[in-house]
Amino acid sequence: MSSFASFLDMWRDLDKYLSSLTIFNIQSSFMRIFLLFLFFVLFTFGVEGYVIEEINGSTGLRIHKEIKRKVYITEDALITETEKEFMVQKIENGLPRIYRVIKSSKSYMDFSKMTPLFLVSLPFLDCKQRVCVVNRGAFRPTNEYKKIRGFKARKVVVESHALGKKTTLIQWYTKEWKELVEANRLEDKFYVNFIRAIMKEKNLSEANIPLKEIQNFLKEINEKFGGVVRTQQQMPLFNTYSEVISVKKTEIPDYIYKLPEGYTKIK
């Protein structure tokens, strides 16, 4: 059942309940309408998006660590939750924002001044002196396949040269997990919107950042290869990995979507 249908059922049940009461003359239609309106104002709808649950781990010499995390995705927010904190990337009033929200102390740090670094973190984007170009060669699909979470996945080698340092990732893409494909499509839409917000804030144009080409490239990858079910990276002393364990289309709760609202800023 859709969330809107559930809300209508809740509305009808509340109306029946109010109609049955005699205290404060709630049986009067005017009073019932007033209380229903008050309920409507207080009832907060979430923003529709996707929630991806992942396992993140690292292995190496005397190292084996694994944690679970959730990733909340909308068109204008990408929020990662672990046991102790939220990492928030979002667009507020058309501008890019990055926050680290600490659960235990109900506080947050504002890293929004670092948003341009987001551009150099994208493996398919080479940026120098305020000019970025799409590097299609960074994305190298192979003919190796295997089953991950019950879905046929294809191995893709992704190379990045961010900040002059070469980094190689192994990503496994699947077209069979439809919800994951759609979630990644929405995530790509967020990336495009976030880059657009950075361009607005830094007064950059298509001559600096080829936004349309980026959008087309992400769309092409999603349509041709699907969604990323697993990512691996080999480091000198240890290896890291992340693997998707569940995907759900749902409404993102307001208390998540509006972060860091309700938390105290660390100055």
Curated annotation (Swiss-Prot):
Bilayer topology term: Single-pass membrane protein
Taxonomic superkingdom: Bacteria
Q: Does the keyword Transmembrane helix apply?
A: yes
Give GO cellular component annotations, separated by semicolons: membrane
Name under which the protein is recorded: Uncharacterized protein aq_555
Enumerate the UniProt keywords alphabetically: Membrane, Transmembrane, Transmembrane helix
Q: Where in the cell is it found?
A: Membrane
Where the protein is mainly located, per its record? membrane
Sequence intervals crossing the membrane? 30-52
